[in-house]
Amino acid sequence: MSNKTRLDLLLVERGLEQTRQRAQAMIMSGLVFVDGQRVDKAGTAVPNDAQIEVRGNTLRYVSRGGLKLEKAMTTFGLKLDGCICADIGASTGGFTDCMLQNGATKVYAVDVGYGQLDWKLRSDERVVCMERTNARYLDRDQIPDELDFASIDVSFISLKLILPAVHRVLKEGGHVACLIKPQFEAGREKVGKKGVVRDPDVHLEVLENFLTHAKDSGFTVLDITFSSIRGPEGNIEYLGYLESGDWVEKTFDLQGLVEQSHAALDHGKEGAGC
């Protein structure tokens, strides 16, 4: 019988966190120390009798994804008080949680998966849980409300296929914050081992294509920045801020943005997360 257990499971067993998802988020946030040493990989096997400490502020949201939307709100000046929103690619519900904590009155939590949304959110009357729903085919029959805001955090599918659907359910002048993930936007031949895209030139190409996809889908791109939290396996990701309506030409220093993101994240200033 093994005398070691995954760190995320141990956190739950010892009552240091309520769910495995939250335990994983806490670990990847760098808040967990085992025998005095920081461990930031949730799957690390540690001795069953190890001393485990949680240091610093615990996570405000049900998953670390909420921190990504929090940064978008701060950077883009987003206000969600009284808004009807959608969380596209909700998963555990970090974005949904962030929306509710910032005043959203209703959130449609959309995900192609099943059984992932945190129970706290699943049982919240302000949340409409839309599991087993492919966001690519969203329409007004599924979301009858006119949405003020939508977030997009999807994997294994390009934003090129998601943005037109989001445009269909968003009101004119509504806003979108979306994660731009090079590993799912670049061609397969440009994705490295373990699904990581490291080449800055590929990142630049992805961002240029994103501007085109947004315009073709009926959006104006208001701003772009990089996410201070890397994706799984350490991928650098970007955040786009869009408005539904006629295209307004704006100029972005995409080359400078890519250089800034690599300078900030390639040197380990932020850990990988989900």
Protein language model features and the residues they cover:
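Short, glycine-/aromatic-enriched active-site segment of Class I SAM-dependent methyltransferases
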Residues: 182-199
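A short glycine-rich, Lys/Arg-flanked "PGG" loop and its adjoining helix->strand segment in the class I
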Residues: 160-177
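Conserved S-adenosyl-L-methionine
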Residues: 98-106
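Flexible, glycine-/basic-rich loop-and-beta segments that form/coincide
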Residues: 236, 241-274
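S-adenosyl-L-methionine
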Residues: 105-161
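Glycine-rich SAM-binding Motif I of class I
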Residues: 93-94, 115
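Conserved class I S-adenosyl-L-methionine
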Residues: 81-91
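A basic, amphipathic helix-loop patch mediating RNA/tRNA/ribosome contacts
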Residues: 1-50, 84-85
